[in-house]
From Swiss-Prot:
The keyword Transferase does not apply. One of its GO terms (cellular component) is cytosolic small ribosomal subunit. One of the primary rRNA binding proteins, it binds specifically to the 5'-end of 16S ribosomal RNA. Part of the 30S ribosomal subunit. This is Small ribosomal subunit protein uS17. The lineage of its organism: Bacteria, Bacillati, Bacillota, Bacilli, Bacillales. It comes from the Bacteria. Belongs to the universal ribosomal protein uS17 family. It comes from Bacillus cereus (strain ATCC 14579 / DSM 31 / CCUG 7414 / JCM 2152 / NBRC 15305 / NCIMB 9373 / NCTC 2599 / NRRL B-3711). The gene is rpsQ. It holds the Pfam family Ribosomal_S17. GO terms for molecular function: rRNA binding; structural constituent of ribosome.
Length: 87
């Protein structure tokens, strides 16, 4: 059980749910510039496994690192933090 706590966990926004059992999650992080100290925003997209196809476009989700599930999938959906409001 202690090994499971060492897995990376990211929170991001679902930007694509068109694939079957797969979502694309955009994770935004801030890094401080080493010389100037300014915080710079970085973003990266991760593909995550969604077994029940429950996450929808715009949802805020938490993804957890797992074994390689395909050529590009290394994460799985852990929980839906906030559902998107459709207007």
């Amino acid at each position: 059980m202690s090994e499971r706590n060492q897995r990376k966990v990211y929170t991001g926004r679902v930007v694509s749910d068109k694939m079957d059992k797969t979502i694309t999650v955009l994770v935004e992080t801030y890094k401080t510039h080493s010389l100037y100290g300014k915080r710079v925003k970085y973003s990266k997209k991760y593909k995550a496994h969604d077994e029940q196809n429950q996450a929808k476009l715009g949802d805020i989700v938490k993804i957890m690192e797992t074994r390689p599930l395909s050529a590009t999938k290394r994460f799985r959906l852990d929980e839906i933090v906030e559902e998107a409001v459709i207007i």
